[in-house]
């Protein structure tokens, strides 16, 4: 009797272990989204606080948090800096663990107003949840004074979705304002600007070369500040205009138009045509400048301010490009600061010439035209950045490749005129850089390497519950595998790249009907399908037998490598 009881216990333990090993291996370890990311909120008058308690082993994506007010106006929330996170498919991002509190200022809320909060997260084990949306009822709040003052300018967060992260246009622009300083210094060495510095220096000093070094430095600095004032004002005006038309400036047709303008500005730097103010206006501004008295702080400052309005053919294109660039940001600080640093960069060589004389200036020559051409390539980087938003990442990579090949190819050809021996090493570097930049174009024209063009499973796409029922009915006695996929699911992409492409997996699935549902949009049909299948998150792969019934303990949640998945298939489909 004791022997039989012991045998039954061993059989039970063996069956339990087998189910744990080959069955629904990950389904029990993942909790519903409400438990993984417990959401709560509190409102006190104008201050609303959104709280998340994040279960250990789970995290929220910073860039996936959005708020959408209805019958209310809220200030754009500022999320705290998250923990750096990187994966193969989505690159660098920021995540939150443990707990998160986000303060939101409610500027105005009518009775019955609500705030929809959308968020998304994953488990560290490679399991991602669909975007979750919670509706927060808002207590009625009277408009603040700032809202009343700006009633003519609706808040960006009024009645439209606001993504509360650093993905605003100002944050995603490719260059920081510091680059404007370097661009200004570079423009100073173009053929239209550099030869003018000795003349401008003499005008600033009022023809008196007996001034002390301190006095000369002061006058030169004042002149540069006058020029910087004009440029800063231009930056503020353009950034403010960009702020008023922020949404329009992000539409595809505007981005394409701006890109075309940037290309024209670059062509002017290549010498195809001359771009400058009308001669009559330049003459009038020059006469105004000549009436100022050099050698005096007030007169020098006025000359600098007027000089900021007189654009030479070499400065018009870079200045126009920077102005259009900061209009994309709608950021007043960025607009004013960028143009100030640009003017400061142009003024630094003038300060050196005024204080130390012409001996610090390099000799004029063809190299100045090459500097001007190089800035044409810098301007061409801006349309590539803008078009990348419209055309998508693959075409963006190809455009960057074309620009890189063009720049390094031009630099290589230009360097062939050099006679110094050390330039041979530079030529090798330039040629190598051009070849590296050409790689995306080679892959596009001649096809990706064979190793990357692996055969993938031929899925039949379904979108609704009815599609699933029809596909199961038409399976004709074959087993069915349903793969639930979404673009925001990292492990789904890992399945696609590493598991489904493996020969042993494809052999194990031979004879099975392969279905796939893309639930990226999280639409009503997607939600209904996930609810019907009782799916918490992705990746989830479900197996059905020849009668259309789900195979017990066959469901896979979380990533599986090819050998483990092939073993699972043999145990469930055979």
Swiss-Prot record:
Top EC class of this enzyme: oxidoreductase
Domain Thioredoxin: 430-574
Listed transmembrane segments: 173-193, 218-238, 253-273, 306-326, 333-353, 367-387, 399-419
Annotated signal sequence range: 1-19
Region ranges (Disordered): 147-169
GO term, biological process aspect, one: cell redox homeostasis
Coiled-coil positions: none
Metal-binding listed as a keyword: no
Membrane topology: Multi-pass membrane protein
GO CC field: plasma membrane
Major location category of this protein: membrane
Subcellular location: Cell inner membrane
Keyword Lipoprotein set for record: no
Keywords: Cell inner membrane, Cell membrane, Cytochrome c-type biogenesis, Disulfide bond, Electron transport, Membrane, NAD, Oxidoreductase, Redox-active center, Signal, Transmembrane, Transmembrane helix, Transport
Stretches with biased composition (Polar residues): 152-169
Top-level taxon: Bacteria
Disulfide bonds: 122-128, 192-314, 489-492
EC numbers: 1.8.1.8
Substrates-to-products reaction catalysed: [protein]-dithiol + NAD(+) = [protein]-disulfide + NADH + H(+); [protein]-dithiol + NADP(+) = [protein]-disulfide + NADPH + H(+)
Pfam family, one: DsbD_N
A GO term, aspect molecular function: electron transfer activity
Family to which the UniProt record says this protein belongs: Belongs to the thioredoxin family. DsbD subfamily.
Function as written in the Swiss-Prot or TrEMBL entry: Required to facilitate the formation of correct disulfide bonds in some periplasmic proteins and for the assembly of the periplasmic c-type cytochromes. Acts by transferring electrons from cytoplasmic thioredoxin to the periplasm. This transfer involves a cascade of disulfide bond formation and reduction steps.
Protein name as annotated: Thiol:disulfide interchange protein DsbD
Native source organism of the sequence: Cronobacter sakazakii (strain ATCC BAA-894) (Enterobacter sakazakii)
């Amino acid at each position: 009797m004791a022997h039989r009881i012991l045998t039954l216990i061993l059989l039970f333990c063996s069956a339990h272990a087998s189910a744990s090993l080959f069955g629904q291996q990950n389904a029990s370890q993942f909790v519903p989204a409400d438990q993984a990311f417990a959401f709560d909120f509190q409102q006190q008058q104008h201050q609303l606080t959104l709280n998340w308690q994040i279960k250990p082993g789970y995290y929220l994506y910073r860039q996936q948090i959005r708020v959408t007010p209805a019958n209310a106006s809220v200030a754009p929330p500022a999320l705290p800096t998250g923990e750096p996170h990187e994966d193969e498919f989505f690159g660098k991002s920021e995540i939150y663990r443990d707990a998160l509190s986000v303060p939101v200022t409610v500027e105005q809320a009518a009775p019955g107003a609500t705030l929809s909060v959308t968020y998304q997260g994953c488990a560290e084990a490679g399991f991602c949840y669909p975007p979750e949306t919670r509706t927060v009822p808002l207590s009625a709040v009277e408009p603040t004074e700032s809202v009343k003052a700006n009633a003519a300018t609706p808040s960006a967060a009024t009645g439209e979705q606001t993504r509360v992260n650093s993905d605003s246009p100002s944050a995603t622009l490719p260059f920081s304002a510091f680059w404007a300083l370097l661009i200004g210094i570079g423009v100073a060495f173009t053929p239209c600007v550099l030869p003018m510095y000795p003349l401008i220096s003499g005008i600033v000093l009022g023809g008196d070369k007996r001034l002390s070094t301190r006095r000369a430095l002061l006058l030169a600095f004042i002149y540069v500040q006058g020029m910087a004032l004009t440029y800063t004002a231009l930056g503020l005006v353009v950034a403010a205009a960009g702020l008023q038309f922020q949404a329009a400036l992000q539409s595809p047709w505007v981005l394409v138009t701006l890109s075309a303008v940037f290309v024209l500005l670059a062509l002017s730097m290549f010498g195809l045509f001359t771009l400058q103010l009308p001669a009559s206006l330049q003459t009038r501004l020059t006469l105004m400048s000549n009436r100022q008295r050099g050698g005096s702080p007030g007169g020098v400052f006025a000359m600098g301010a007027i000089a900021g309005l007189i654009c030479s053919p070499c400065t018009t294109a870079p200045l126009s490009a920077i102005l259009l660039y900061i209009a994309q940001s709608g950021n007043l600080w960025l607009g004013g600061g960028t143009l100030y640093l640009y003017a400061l960069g142009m003024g630094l060589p003038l300060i050196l010439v005024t204080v130390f004389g012409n001996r610090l200036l390099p000799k004029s020559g063809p190299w100045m035209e090459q500097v001007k051409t190089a800035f044409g390539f810098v301007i061409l980087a801006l349309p590539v950045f803008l078009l990348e938003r419209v055309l998508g990442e693959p075409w963006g990579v190809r455009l960057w490749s074309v620009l890189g090949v063009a720049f390094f190819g031009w630099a290589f050809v230009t360097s062939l005129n050099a006679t110094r021996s050390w330039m041979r090493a530079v030529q090798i570097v330039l040629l190598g850089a051009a070849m590296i930049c050409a790689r995306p174009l080679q892959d596009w024209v001649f096809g990706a390497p064979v190793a990357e063009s692996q055969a993938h499973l031929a899925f039949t796409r379904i979108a609704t519950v009815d599609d699933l029922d029809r596909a199961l009915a038409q399976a004709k006695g074959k087993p069915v595998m349903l793969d639930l996929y979404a673009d925001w699911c990292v492990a789904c992409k890992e399945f696609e790249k590493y598991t489904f492409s493996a020969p042993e997996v494809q052999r194990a699935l031979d004879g099975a009907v392969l279905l796939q549902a893309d639930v990226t949009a999280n639409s009503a049909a997607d939600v209904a399908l996930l609810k019907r299948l009782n799916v918490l998150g992705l990746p989830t792969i479900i197996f059905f037998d020849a009668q259309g019934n789900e195979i017990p303990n066959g469901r896979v949640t979380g990533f599986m490598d090819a050998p483990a998945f092939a073993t699972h298939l043999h145990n469930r489909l055979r």
